[in-house]
Amino acid sequence: MIRRQKNKKFELVSKFQPAGDQEQAIKKLTDGFEQGEKAQILEGATGTGKTFTMANVIAKLNKPTLVISHNKTLVGQLYGEFKEFFPKNAVDYFVSYYDYYQPEAYVPQSDTYIEKDSSINDEIDQLRHKTTSDLMSRNDVIVVASVSCIYGLGDPREYAASVVSISGGQEISRDVLLRDLVNIQYDRNDIDFQRGRFRVRGDVVEIFPAGYSDHAFRVEFFGDEIDRIVEVNSLTGEVIGEREQVSIFPATHFVTNEQIMQRALASIKDEMNIQVKKFEGEGKLLEAQRIKQRTTYDMEMMSEVGYTNGIENYSRHMEGRKAGQPPHTLLDFFPDDFLILIDESHATMPELKAMYNGDSARKQTLIDYGFRLPSALDNRPLKLEEFEKHVNQIMYVSATPGDYELNQTDHKVEQIIRPTGLLDPEIEVRPIKGQIDDLVGEINKRIDRNERVFVTTLTKKMAEDLTDYLKDLGIKVRYLHSDIKTLERLEIIRDLRLGKFDVLIGINLLREGIDVPEVSLVAILDADKEGFLRSTRPLVQTIGRAARNSNGKVIMYADSITDSMREAIDATERRRSLQMKFNKEHGITPKTIVKPIRDVISITKDSDEKENKESFADLNFDELTKKQKQTMIKTLTAQMQEAAKKLDFEEAANLRDAIMDLQKQVHEKKK
């Protein structure tokens, strides 16, 4: 069993001091929580330093903190910022580890069963393991998470009870340690040493913990006693330092043992028999035969190898929960007295609320047609009311708080003044006729000043067509769409800041928290098309993207001014007048935010090294002209031949694949 260290304190490191109206916001929020307020709202205009205010509140309250945001791009951005603010504390990243996920489903209309299919990102899985191990072992932890934190994660009590703790001088035989490691799902592999594995060389056992990316532990035995434990680089074997004691956390969050498995199998069999009788009684013989066959197969797999595809659907039985009882989630890994910060709460809270309903509808169809047992419904995200029961103290952070937050509390703190003196952007409404030509002219002005541009459209088709049109004009442009993978999204934002391209076009991905100070123009096409993406809150958020640059300007292309546009414009002008008044009183000249460009997610790669070592894999072939592609094919062919000479066949194969991809594109253009 492991004990959580409770004496660690958060240490905020920043060259900045609270400025503008940050100081009063920090004081009001901290005082409110210390006086017992359960919920508070920080209504902060874009660019006023809400993240810095959040960091100060965390440091002053000194409680384990969960920061939830509604999309992975923002989670990555916040994670990078909090790591800089708290370099001596544990800052963790927790999002869904699927790069690709096709949930199991059944479509009755066409009698189509869709098998679950997924692709797991190993780096994110490692970061998730680091999160839970940090929460179990220390109190100075900040976890930055997406809404996946309300999905099932296994029982934290079983997880903690399964931790293997070893120390120098401990009497334990090598074979007992190996058996303990196997029990917590570590694999022995003496050749391919990876996370969640161990290897044995005589009296030396090397363990690669699931939550580490490049460090392992070497345990040296003398007879039946641990002689020494050293931390080593998992790749080179270089000794990093000696350790008196280490805790090895399970390689899976869903810890089980023989006793739990046998109890679960008996419970699953009972439920299967009840469901078979129910279907037979209703005359649904196909469904009865289907559920019996599928469940029996799963039970045999679980009995023989301890696992089956879709084992998460039996989580209620594995954890011994009652029907309808909520699953264990990341929130259960926190101590009772913890703090929750909801970033961009107007978007995050509706998403938290929607998770359960969407999951439930899909699973009910699988149950009705005999593909899953009714207990599959209990492998689910938390309902909103279940999430609320976990809340000790919570702070909602947004430039435009939603109705839910406003109904939860009347303790609202406003933060309008930016430390840099920056004003809310000027807003201009221009007619739709000739909007593209007008936009091109505005883009070229920004390119001449080495500034960046955001363009938000209403449809995917328009975004794609506009991207192609601007490319043909020689403008460096990218289109940020929903199919782009998590870490690639962050790279695109980073490349925009670095100036690898000048214009980013999107639909709904540009609104909340995409923090690019270099952006001086935000163009909103079809601003008068009233609807979800052109209502007041989204418009205010979109306007805010230009508020981090002293030349910030927003152009709305519209033939009329809707109520939503009027509200957004009025709110912006109100803040702008307050900011101008503050600047005048204090003699402040607005200046663009200077923000370092960093490799947002990776905790293992050096961002500068990545910057210098440009790889062909980072290139977007779609942006190249036909002539550039042909030149690139020649260059890559030479590199491939060079790699083959050096016997670096993996690099040669990667280059070959890139060449084939380019040749295919050139060939298609000829057609």
Curated annotation (Swiss-Prot):
Domain Helicase C-terminal, first and last residues per copy: 435-601
Name the positions where ATP binds.
Answer: G44, A45, T46, G47, T48, G49, K50, T51
The UniProt function text for this chain reads:
The UvrABC repair system catalyzes the recognition and processing of DNA lesions. A damage recognition complex composed of 2 UvrA and 2 UvrB subunits scans DNA for abnormalities. Upon binding of the UvrA(2)B(2) complex to a putative damaged site, the DNA wraps around one UvrB monomer. DNA wrap is dependent on ATP binding by UvrB and probably causes local melting of the DNA helix, facilitating insertion of UvrB beta-hairpin between the DNA strands. Then UvrB probes one DNA strand for the presence of a lesion.
Q: Which HAMAP family match?
A: UvrB (MF_00204)
Quote the NCBIfam families the UniProt record gives: PRK05298.1 (NF003673), uvrb (TIGR00631)
User: What interactions and quaternary structure are annotated?
Assistant: Forms a heterotetramer with UvrA during the search for lesions. Interacts with UvrC in an incision complex.
- From the Swiss-Prot or TrEMBL record, give the protein name: UvrABC system protein B
Q: Which organism is this entry from?
A: Lactobacillus gasseri (strain ATCC 33323 / DSM 20243 / BCRC 14619 / CIP 102991 / JCM 1131 / KCTC 3163 / NCIMB 11718 / NCTC 13722 / AM63)
Q: What is the lineage of its organism?
A: Bacteria, Bacillati, Bacillota, Bacilli, Lactobacillales
